[in-house]
Amino acid sequence: MKPVLVLAILAVLFLRLADSVPRPLDVVVSEIRSAHFRVEENQCWFHMGMLYFKGRMSGNFTEKHFVNVGIVSQSYMDRLQVSGEQYHHDERGAYFEWNIGGHPVTHTVDMVDITLSTRWGDPKKYAACVPQVRMDYSSQTINWYLQRSMRDDNWGLLFRTLLVYLFSLVVLVLLTVGVSARLRFI
């Protein structure tokens, strides 16, 4: 009974560890160009080699405004245009929402820029987001986390990934080999 209880407690701890990953950093640029616009939500994260963006910006918008979400890297530059269908206007005012899921990234991403411009104006940077890695320990993702942690020299991610992988191997061996619940060391 003790090993089952210990394994259940460890499973709960690891599940809580996966859920306790900090929320993505919200880095708002200090030089806001106008007090008429406000970034209310700004998140970006990695999951299985894909980059996800989610955010909301409100203010004094017209249909001529559009928001660009761009990936900034030392070796690569990509601008994802968010316009048209994300523009909303209701009793609270006009706002933009973006929820871009699963943009494939094969390079190092340093930052995600949020820029605002009109059809004829120059884009002005309003916010930036540093992507965080969201943890999902399944058999398909372990290899991706190991590669990413070694590439980025992220020892915490490497340690957590190896710990969860070894724990899952031990549980797999205990369940498949049929070891009795009376282990001497527990």
Curated annotation (Swiss-Prot):
Residues of this chain annotated as glycosylated in UniProt: N60
GO molecular function, one term: D-mannose binding
Segments traversing the membrane: 161-181
PTM statement from Swiss-Prot or TrEMBL: The signal sequence is not cleaved. N-glycosylated; mostly exists in a high-mannose form.
Domain Ig-like H-type: start-end pairs: 35-133
Top-level taxonomic group: Viruses
Membrane topology qualifier: Single-pass type I membrane protein
Positions on the Cytoplasmic side per record topology: 182-186
Compartments, as annotated in UniProt: Host endoplasmic reticulum membrane
Record function comment: Retains, but does not degrade MHC class I heterodimers in the endoplasmic reticulum during the immediate-early period of virus infection, thereby impairing their transport and maturation. Forms a complex with beta-2-microglobulin-associated class I heavy chains, which accumulate in the ER. In consequence, infected cells are masked for immune recognition by cytotoxic T-lymphocytes.
Family per similarity comment: Belongs to the cytomegalovirus US2 family.
Annotated protein name in UniProt: Membrane glycoprotein US3
Source organism of the structure: Human cytomegalovirus (strain AD169) (HHV-5)
Taxonomic placement: Viruses, Duplodnaviria, Heunggongvirae, Peploviricota, Herviviricetes
Name of the gene encoding the protein in the UniProt record: US3
